[in-house]
């Protein structure tokens, strides 16, 4: 009998919002993994798998960006959509304290606070995207519009 995965905060929140989703799991030793290897482990094309990045403008002014795993956040475009002059990625050591999530398991859903969130516009035309479910080894497959609704996100050109 297969072992049932424990629900994360991200899963609980989307269930409360009656959002359709699928949990995808993969074997892990608990160490952080990169998004490209996650796509390979779950057997999906890179175009569907997105990573969650957290950036800051000054002190305690955080933004969340959801971008394809094979792409990089364009910080100039990101600053423009946020209305900030400059944003920078937060240090890895700050991630847990700011979001409540570890590197490799950071979900745009269910962070400690609801930060302004932007999903790359490339996701809008897809039937589904895959993001972290809030822990290493667990991903969520859901419609991009449902992801946006779940974390009050906007779509924007950010890569």
UniProtKB/Swiss-Prot annotation:
Any GO MF annotation of the entry: lyase activity
Annotated InterPro entries: Prolyl-tRNA_editing_YbaK/EbsC, YbaK/aa-tRNA-synt-asso_dom_sf, YbaK/aa-tRNA-synth-assoc-dom
SUPFAM superfamilies reported in the protein's UniProt record: YbaK/ProRS associated domain
Entry's transmembrane regions: none
EC number: 4.2.-.-
GO BP annotation list: translation
Pfam families with a match to the protein in the record: tRNA_edit (PF04073)
Alphabetized UniProt keyword annotations: Lyase, Protein biosynthesis
Entry's family note: Belongs to the prolyl-tRNA editing family. YbaK/EbsC subfamily.
Name of the protein this chain belongs to: Putative Cys-tRNA(Pro)/Cys-tRNA(Cys) deacylase YjdI
Lineage summary: Bacteria, Bacillati, Bacillota, Bacilli, Bacillales
Recorded name of the encoding gene: yjdI
């Amino acid at each position: 009998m297969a072992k049932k995965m424990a629900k994360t905060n991200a899963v609980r929140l989307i269930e409360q919002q009656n959002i359709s989703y699928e949990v995808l799991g993969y074997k892990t030793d608990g160490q952080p993994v990169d998004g490209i290897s996650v796509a390979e482990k779950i057997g999906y094309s890179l175009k569907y798998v997105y990573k969650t990045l957290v950036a800051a403008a000054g002190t305690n002014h955080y933004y969340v960006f959801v971008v394809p795993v094979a792409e990089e956040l364009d910080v100039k475009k990101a600053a423009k959509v946020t209305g900030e002059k400059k944003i920078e990625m937060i240090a890895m050591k700050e991630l847990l304290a700011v979001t409540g999530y570890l590197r490799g398991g950071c979900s745009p859903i269910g962070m400690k606070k609801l930060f302004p969130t932007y999903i790359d516009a490339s996701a809008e035309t897809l039937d589904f995207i895959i993001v972290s479910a809030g822990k290493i080894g667990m991903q969520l497959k859901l419609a991009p519009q449902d992801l946006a609704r779940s974390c009050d996100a906007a779509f924007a050109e950010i890569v």
